[in-house]
Every structure is written in C-alpha cells, then in structure tokens.
C-alpha cells in the first residue's frame, strides 16, 4: 500500500506549515505541499475575485496530485498538504478533491484539523516572519478575526479518519509526533 496523504486543514496562522515541517524532520520520507505553493502562482496572474482564479487553483491542485500523489515513483513518500477550507460549497468541493486523489492513488487519506486560541492565532498570523515573507499569507488581524467569527472550518463528517488538535500550547514537534503516530495507526488498519 502507498504511503498516506495527510491533509492539514486550519485557519491561516494556526501553524500548518510549521507542523508540516516538523513532520518532515521526524518522518523518513515526507513531501510537503504548502497551500501557498498552489495559491501564489495563481495569485500572480489573477486576483481572487477574477472568475479564472478558482479554475486555475483547481488546475494547480490537479498538477500537484498528478506529480506528488498519483505518480507511482512517489508511492513510498508520505504527502502532506496544508490547506484552509471552510464549510461552504467551494471548501467542501476542494476538500473532496484531496480525498479523491488519495483514493485514486491507493493512499490512506488522513485529514488533520488544527485549531488554536484566537489571540494566539492573531499573534502567529501577524508575526514578523509572515508579515515580511514572500508569500500571500494572511497577515491582517481584522480579516482573520472576521474569518474566525463568520466561517466554520470544513471537516469531513462520517469519516472514521481524522483528528482535531489544539495547537495553542503545544510544541510543533509534539504535534508532528501525534500526527505521525495517528497516521501509522491508520496505515496499519488499512
């Protein structure tokens, strides 16, 4: 059986990429696809309100699935995607793309949901590293507060897989160990 696809879904600034990097530092063979690797090339060409934006985002995901998830030469690598999908029509549709890609490739699909205290989330999202970074990461505390008050994070319902982890007071390496342990348990059951 192929190695799992771990899909980390959380609000911006929760620690997705930091935790994915911690997973890679512990795991033997891990490939990380940060959502900004899929967002930023599209954002260079289209504004988020352009009708072509979501079409191009889907194409970027499909290319990533083909290259990293479905290519037989990557079957032994655990693939970790970071994402932010809310519980609306678009968010559900995008989330199911990840699950479908894993199924097509014969990989266990492991959704991970991260949460953290609002004030900690804002502190992380407005860190110097993010504010002066080279990606389109959200750094606006007002917008983040608005997202968190109006949006619900998408979670697969009825799926026996998946865990939710509060990252507020946990070290990223400890969270990575929880995720890897859980993914190994799922892998053994499959």
Predicted regions and their residues:
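Hydrophobic anchor at the beta1->P-loop junction of P-loop NTPases
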Residues: 8
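The conserved Walker
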Residues: 12
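Conserved glycine(s) of the Walker
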Residues: 15
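Conserved substrate/cofactor phosphate-moiety recognition/catalytic segment
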Residues: 18-69
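Glycine-rich phosphate-binding loop used to anchor ATP phosphates in small-molecule kinases
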Residues: 56-113
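Short, amphipathic alpha-helical "lid/cap" segments that border enzyme active or binding sites
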Residues: 61, 65, 172-183
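Conserved phosphate-donor/acceptor-positioning beta-strand/loop module used by diverse small-molecule
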Residues: 103-125, 165
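Small-molecule kinase domains that catalyze NTP-dependent phosphoryl transfer to phosphate-bearing small molecules
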Residues: 123, 127-178, 189-190
């Amino acid at each position: 059986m192929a190695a799992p696809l771990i899909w980390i879904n959380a609000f911006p600034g929760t620690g997705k990429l930091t935790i994915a990097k911690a997973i890679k530092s512990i795991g033997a063979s891990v490939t990380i696809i940060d959502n900004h690797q899929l967002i930023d090339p599209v954002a260079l060409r289209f504004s988020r309100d352009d009708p072509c934006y979501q079409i191009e985002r889907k194409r970027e995901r499909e290319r990533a699935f083909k290259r990293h998830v479905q290519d037989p030469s990557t079957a032994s690598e655990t693939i970790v995607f970071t994402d932010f999908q809310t519980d609306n029509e678009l968010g559900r549709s995008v989330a199911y793309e990840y699950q479908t890609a894993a199924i097509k490739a014969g990989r266990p699909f492991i959704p991970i949901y991260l949460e953290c205290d609002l004030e900690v989330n804002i502190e992380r999202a407005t860190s110097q590293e993010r504010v002066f970074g080279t990606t389109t990461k959200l750094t606006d505390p007002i917008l983040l507060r608005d997202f968190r008050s109006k949006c619900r994070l998408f979670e697969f319902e009825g799926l026996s897989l998946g865990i939710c982890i509060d990252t507020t007071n946990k070290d990223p390496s400890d969270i990575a160990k929880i995720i890897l342990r859980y993914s190994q348990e799922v892998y053994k059951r499959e």
